[in-house]
Protein backbone atom coordinates (compact mmCIF):
# COMPACT_ATOMS: atom_id res chain seq x y z
CA UNK A 1 0.00 0.00 0.00
CA UNK A 2 2.92 2.36 0.54
CA UNK A 3 3.96 2.24 -3.11
CA UNK A 4 0.38 2.79 -4.21
CA UNK A 5 -0.28 5.71 -1.87
CA UNK A 6 2.99 7.34 -2.98
CA UNK A 7 1.44 7.73 -6.45
CA UNK A 8 -1.59 9.58 -5.07
CA UNK A 9 0.41 12.80 -4.64
CA UNK A 10 2.63 14.74 -7.03
CA UNK A 11 5.03 15.21 -4.10
CA UNK A 12 4.90 11.51 -3.23
CA UNK A 13 5.72 10.63 0.40
CA UNK A 14 6.71 14.22 1.22
CA UNK A 15 3.09 15.42 0.91
CA UNK A 16 1.62 16.25 4.35
CA UNK A 17 -1.35 13.88 3.84
CA UNK A 18 0.74 10.93 2.67
CA UNK A 19 1.15 9.42 6.18
CA UNK A 20 -2.63 9.50 6.73
CA UNK A 21 -3.29 7.77 3.41
CA UNK A 22 -0.54 5.23 4.01
CA UNK A 23 -2.03 4.35 7.39
CA UNK A 24 -5.53 4.05 5.94
CA UNK A 25 -4.20 1.70 3.27
CA UNK A 26 -2.54 -0.57 5.78
CA UNK A 27 -5.96 -1.98 6.61
CA UNK A 28 -5.99 -3.75 3.25
CA UNK A 29 -4.13 -7.01 2.91
CA UNK A 30 -2.66 -8.45 -0.25
CA UNK A 31 -5.28 -11.18 -0.57
CA UNK A 32 -8.23 -8.80 -0.33
CA UNK A 33 -6.64 -6.46 -2.89
CA UNK A 34 -6.17 -9.37 -5.30
CA UNK A 35 -9.81 -10.41 -4.82
CA UNK A 36 -11.00 -6.88 -5.58
CA UNK A 37 -8.88 -6.70 -8.73
CA UNK A 38 -10.14 -10.11 -9.91
CA UNK A 39 -13.75 -9.09 -9.29
CA UNK A 40 -13.25 -5.95 -11.37
CA UNK A 41 -11.65 -7.78 -14.31
CA UNK A 42 -14.02 -7.98 -17.19
CA UNK A 43 -16.67 -5.88 -15.44
CA UNK A 44 -17.86 -2.80 -17.23
CA UNK A 45 -20.75 -0.40 -16.96
CA UNK A 46 -19.83 1.47 -20.12
CA UNK A 47 -22.98 0.35 -21.91
CA UNK A 48 -25.13 1.86 -19.14
CA UNK A 49 -23.43 5.24 -18.67
CA UNK A 50 -25.79 6.87 -21.16
CA UNK A 51 -28.67 6.05 -18.78
CA UNK A 52 -27.37 8.46 -16.14
CA UNK A 53 -29.62 11.49 -15.97
CA UNK A 54 -28.21 13.33 -12.98
CA UNK A 55 -25.64 16.13 -13.04
CA UNK A 56 -22.23 14.48 -13.06
CA UNK A 57 -18.88 16.11 -12.36
CA UNK A 58 -15.74 14.21 -13.32
CA UNK A 59 -12.54 15.53 -11.74
CA UNK A 60 -9.08 14.18 -12.45
CA UNK A 61 -5.58 15.34 -11.65
CA UNK A 62 -3.36 15.87 -14.68
CA UNK A 63 -0.66 13.76 -13.03
CA UNK A 64 -2.92 10.95 -11.77
CA UNK A 65 -1.11 7.62 -12.10
CA UNK A 66 -3.78 5.56 -10.32
CA UNK A 67 -6.43 5.97 -12.99
CA UNK A 68 -5.77 6.41 -16.68
CA UNK A 69 -6.77 9.80 -18.09
CA UNK A 70 -8.56 7.91 -20.87
CA UNK A 71 -10.90 6.38 -18.25
CA UNK A 72 -12.02 9.82 -17.09
CA UNK A 73 -12.42 11.01 -20.67
CA UNK A 74 -14.46 7.90 -21.46
CA UNK A 75 -16.81 8.72 -18.55
CA UNK A 76 -17.19 12.30 -19.76
CA UNK A 77 -17.88 11.23 -23.33
CA UNK A 78 -20.51 8.67 -22.30
CA UNK A 79 -22.41 10.42 -19.50
CA UNK A 80 -24.86 12.88 -21.06
CA UNK A 81 -24.29 16.47 -19.97
CA UNK A 82 -21.40 15.57 -17.69
CA UNK A 83 -18.75 18.14 -16.81
CA UNK A 84 -15.06 17.25 -17.07
CA UNK A 85 -12.39 19.07 -15.10
CA UNK A 86 -8.64 18.48 -15.01
CA UNK A 87 -6.81 19.87 -11.98
CA UNK A 88 -3.27 21.02 -12.78
CA UNK A 89 -0.30 19.64 -10.88
CA UNK A 90 -2.43 17.07 -9.05
CA UNK A 91 -2.32 13.31 -8.86
CA UNK A 92 -5.01 10.94 -7.51
CA UNK A 93 -5.35 12.94 -4.28
CA UNK A 94 -6.39 16.16 -6.01
CA UNK A 95 -8.88 16.92 -3.23
CA UNK A 96 -5.99 16.87 -0.74
CA UNK A 97 -3.35 18.49 -2.95
CA UNK A 98 -5.41 21.52 -3.98
CA UNK A 99 -8.39 21.54 -1.61
CA UNK A 100 -9.35 25.17 -2.25
CA UNK A 101 -9.48 24.69 -6.01
CA UNK A 102 -11.20 21.32 -5.68
CA UNK A 103 -13.84 22.72 -3.30
CA UNK A 104 -14.46 25.73 -5.55
CA UNK A 105 -15.03 23.49 -8.55
CA UNK A 106 -17.38 21.20 -6.63
CA UNK A 107 -19.15 24.15 -4.99
CA UNK A 108 -19.67 25.97 -8.29
CA UNK A 109 -20.95 22.75 -9.87
CA UNK A 110 -23.43 22.19 -7.04
CA UNK A 111 -24.66 25.79 -7.11
CA UNK A 112 -25.14 25.64 -10.87
CA UNK A 113 -27.03 22.37 -10.76
CA UNK A 114 -29.14 23.12 -7.68
CA UNK A 115 -30.76 26.15 -9.34
CA UNK A 116 -33.40 24.00 -10.98
CA UNK A 117 -34.05 21.66 -8.05
Feature roles, as predicted:
Residues 81-117:
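Catalytic active-site module of serine/aspartate enzymes centered on a nucleophile-bearing elbow/loop
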Residues 52, 58-60, 64:
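Short beta-strand/loop motif that positions the catalytic acidic residue
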Residues 65-71:
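Conserved alpha/beta-hydrolase "acid-adjacent" motif
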Residues 1-51:
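Conserved alpha/beta-hydrolase catalytic His-Asp/Glu region
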Residues 27, 78, 96:
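Conserved catalytic core of Hanks-type protein kinase domains
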Residues 53-54, 80-81:
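Active-site acidic short loop of glycosyltransferases
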Residues 4, 37, 75, 102, ...:
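Hydrophobic "lid"/C-terminal helical patch
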Amino acid sequence: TERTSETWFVEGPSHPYYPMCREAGRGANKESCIKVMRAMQGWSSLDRLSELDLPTLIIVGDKDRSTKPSDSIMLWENIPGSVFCVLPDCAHGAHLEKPDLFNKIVGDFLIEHMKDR
